[in-house]
Amino acid sequence: SVVVTRDAARIAAVADAIGTMPWIKGAPILLLVCGDIRRGRQVCAHHGRAHANDSIDTFLNASADAALALGFAVMAADALGLGTCPISYVRNHLALIEDLFALPAGVFPVAGLALG
């Protein structure tokens, strides 16, 4: 999952929480790249099946998917001439980030990506 915000106040709140990256406030767009461990469970439940890999495998797959999405977002932004700054520090402030972006249970931030 990717949450996109152009809300300067929300972007500033992320920068303030991190405290060591003030340049984040200058980004016109912030992507929050998330892992989603709900999706497999929801699909299985929809089809009336047990989620056979409901283990650390689910977490690892969600994390890897998010990392791939982050990498491809960086490449796409570069192709468009946009600068990027990946922000792993969002994981150091989980409660704030989850609240600020209204993340549902089972969705967790992997990294932010400042674009501009």
Feature locations, PLM:
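N-terminal amphipathic, basic helical "cap/leader" segment at the start of enzyme domains
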Residues: S1-C34, G40
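Acidic, glycine-rich active-site loops and adjacent beta-strand->loop/helix elements
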Residues: A8, I37, V90-L94
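A glycine-rich helix N-cap at a beta->alpha junction
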Residues: P22-V33, F101-G116
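Short, flexible, mixed-charge acidic loops at enzyme active sites
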Residues: R41-A50
